[in-house]
Amino acid sequence: MNINKHLILLFSVLFFLFAVSVSSGCFRKNESDVKSVVRNELDQLKNLDSETTQKYIPYTELFPDATENTDLTDEINKTFSLFFRKFNYKISDVIVGTANHSATVSVKLTTIDSKVLARDFKAELLRTQITESAQAQKGSIKDSSRSLEAHYLILNHLLNTNDYDTAETDCNIQLVNTGNNKKEKWKIQRTNSLEDDLVGGLIADLADPDILSPEDTLTVYLDTLQKLDLKEMTSYLGVVNIMNTSDTAKNSIASALAEQIHKNFNYVIKSSSENGYNATVTTEITTFDSDSILADYQEKLDKYLASADAVIDGSQKRYEKSFEILLNSINDNTVTTVNDVDFVLINDGVSWKLQDEGNTLGNAIFGTLTNSPLETSDSEDENISADTDKQTDDNTSTESSSN
């Protein structure tokens, strides 16, 4: 009897160990299957497989704010290839649910530093929009920077010209078993969180309205302004509209003023403050001294108008002379002025934007030259013309009386 009891106990233990062994083997097999599925998908991303990339990160999802969609082009595929060229991963843990219906794989992903890339992208996009705005105002180009294609061209340019550092992201990949008891079939669940993790948080960073601070945003405005050519600058700042003269005169004076900006403009951001969706950035602006230009112009104009030549020249020549004096005063100016300017920016939920950008920058740079000094000289010229006409009438009356 004792022998039978011992045998039964022994067989029970052996059966239990066998069952545990089989269960453990199945569990390890499930873990291996899950890991294999994840590894296969991530390897395809690592090997720059376009189809896998679009399966997890649809190209339209990266820039949901783009106004004009486009088909998936080779250029867009190249952009994703550039982004994933430093992609790598390391599986750290696999957890399979007790019923084998779900699994979670913990992965450490290595991608390009998305925060730096997103900041560069937003700055380049704003720079492009400012330039296109200047070009559009002079009628040479339409605003196309908001299209999906333009967004990818900017991203492609940044990835081609910059060597970005890498960053690591901890990611949990969820899988579900879509098979049956006889044959398991593990499938990765595609989620917004996974989509963003695979690009290192780039989608969230691009959507961050504060990715560029108010100071960073103003820096883009001012740096871009310095690089605009004469026509773009005068168009963007509305300099042409400052001068109430003929087109030729407008262009000449506007070009002279823009050249003064190129030679003298500089800035130093001193401080900033935020209040909700509003920010004020105090900036030290160095620019040409408009008061000095106007003083020189007025002095030379007064001297000319007091001369006999002004009476003899007639109204048209007086106008041409006053224009010549103003142009020379601008071209000959070497005096600069330094002033603190408070720039107001507003966050519209997408990014920080300079309020009334063209006029704000124009007033900060041109100062008292925001109004045309030629308007004053035109009034003075009318007075001279009236005095001349009166003198002519008086002379005519005197001659008639003598006769």
Task: Please place each PLM-identified region on the residue numbering.
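Core segments of small alpha/beta cavity-forming domains
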Residues: R28-L82, K86, L198-K270, S292
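Sec-dependent N-terminal signal peptides of Gram-positive bacterial secreted proteins and lipoproteins
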Residues: I3-K29
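Surface-exposed, charged secondary-structure patches
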Residues: D74-L158, I253-S329, I384-Q391, E399-N403
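Short glycine-rich, low-complexity/disordered patches
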Residues: Y56-F63, T166-C171, S235-K250, K317-I325, ...
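Short beta-strand edge/turn micro-motifs at domain boundaries
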Residues: V116, A123-A207, K303-K317, N333-N383
